[in-house]
Amino acid sequence: LWDCERSLAELAALCEANHMEAVAEVTQKRQTPETGIVLGSGKLEEAAAAAAELGAECAVFDGELTGSQIRNISTALGGLEVIDRTMLILEIFRSRAVTNEGKLQTELALLRYRLPRLQGMGESLSRQGGGGGGGGGARRGAGETKLELDRRHVHARIDALAEKLAEMEKRRGESRKA
């Protein structure tokens, strides 16, 4: 049986482990979550007011959110960064990784988790790039949205990290044989 108080206490402890202070809690008992925003609009307004009053820098949700939910909630909260429990846990692992391999593994896990949620992160991810303007590999092509560009960069980083990790694994295997 899910215990709301215990889960929120654990979430507050996770925030603390990530050097964040939980300044308010907004809960709602619903049969089914609101599809696009998880909370009802009244509770979301309550959360927005609390966040503004307390100067919150981030809203942490106790559960997994989709990219569109992150975007919708962030918009309703006045552009506040929105993360879910899993992202918070991955951030904790990333910040505590010590070895080079551990750092690469946690960055890879975080990128793989964030990739399908990119549409909800940051602002104006749907803006289109213009054409022209010579050179520059990181530029957007004509009609390429910022979201598409971000996805391309994340895919490239994921590929590079996976390659580095495979290389490390191969070297470790070779040194064991020697």
PLM region spans:
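Flexible beta-alpha connector loops of hexameric P-loop NTPases
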Residues: 2, 32-37, 96-102, 139, ...
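Short secondary-structure transition/capping segments
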Residues: 64-78, 104-113, 130-139
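N-terminal accessory targeting/assembly segments
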Residues: 1-90
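Conserved G1/Walker A P-loop phosphate-binding module
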Residues: 121, 125-178
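Signal for well-folded cores of large energy- and translation-related assemblies
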Residues: 12, 16-19, 52, 74, ...
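Short alpha-helix plus adjacent loop in nuclease-associated cores
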Residues: 87-106
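Short amphipathic alpha-helical segments with heptad-repeat character
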Residues: 98, 105, 109-112, 116, ...
